[in-house]
Amino acid sequence: MFGPPGRILEIPGQWYLTDFSQVEFIPGFQEGMRPAHDLLDRWKAIFDYAVANEEGACYAFVVHPQSIGRAHMITRLEELIVHMQERGAWFATLSEIADATERAV
């Protein structure tokens, strides 16, 4: 036993909500290097669907500094953040999301 029993909340990531698989190139394994607007369009579409159809949805996307930090990518992330802010998104850490979920359950 490692301690008293407790609750576990998993906040899963999704490959289609990560930047790495869309923009990085690994020869023989990963095509990557897709146009930056493709990623932005996909992320916006998924977010807009969640806003319209999934009350209380958690949109947990994953970004990597070596990928999203490039000039042409960081501007797309900024566009996504503005898009989300305009639609009332709550930006929170995973700990804050876990706490809010705990209070709601």
What are these regions (language model features)?
Residues M1-E55:
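Active-site-adjacent pocket scaffolds in enzyme catalytic domains
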